[in-house]
Amino acid sequence: MKKTTKALAAAVFAAAFVGFAANAADFPEMKLSLAHTAAASHAHNQAAKLFAKEVSDMTGGKVQVQVYPAGELGDQPALLDQCFNGGDVDILIASQSNMASYVPKLNALSAPFLFDSYDQAHKTIDNYVMPWMEKDVEEKMHMVPLGVFDYGFRHVTTKGITVKKADDLKGVKIRVPGSAGLLATFDALGANTQTIAYSELYQSLKQGVVAAEENPVATIFADSFYECQDNLALTGHFFDMQALLMNKDKFDSMSPELQKVIKKAGIDAQNLTRKLISGQESEIIEKLKAKGMKVYDVDKQSFKDKMGPAYEKIAKLCGKEELDNLIKAIK
């Protein structure tokens, strides 16, 4: 039965692919740029390359997507600006926090401890988040969402400090990105939050400017933070996601057939990040241990008990109704 099912699935995919290929002559020659800030070894770059390959394959090579990883074309605010204004970036991968500067209600997604598992997060993204944000992203950002990439659950790393409960972070100088939710989270814990550009984070850790940072394990490993941090606390305080976005004018200029190609490639790229980020998390933690990091489980309830002020701040930014509706959708 399993072999029959797999064979049928393969046949359906092949038929769909042939359908695209058969119409390859209908696609115009076109070059698109896709830029992001993740390391070349990161799952997001693998997904970006899959997107480029599928677009090329499904258009018979007529449409080529050039991928620019690791901030080659600028940091995320710069990439968003270029894409928003129809500059050199046609497609980009953007964080929720950077998108929230255009669409304030997206701040709701920055609330701490919203999700307990990858499965819960994925179901909420598919059934609520995508339709919830699509219209506003198109109207206020002038971009079309093509998918939501997993970035992973964020955890805390430290140098010379063991974190097992919330109070262990009190007074600790920690780098936090400019996300309203993450800043509110660590402020509520009594940490000494510092907003440092990601491009400067490694050197800041190495030089002791900050003693701690927080990121998904895939990022911690890909960017070699284990070289200047010796402890990993599995706080899982925030499920991070980033959107694959395309300039709306560019998308609208395409034929319906090419739009279908772009959207299919976007969802396939999204699903690859889900497979890689969640599927490799345990393996990456073992790799971090092998690099010398000590890994600790934490008392998550001690963290959750302190999140009241963080939720109040976030509700003011996104609107209490938006935050309440998101929480209801998750439950």
Predicted regions and their residues:
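N-terminal secretory/targeting leader peptides
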Residues: A10, A25-K123, V129, K135-K331
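Short, low-complexity disordered leader/linker segments with a strong preference
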Residues: M1-K31
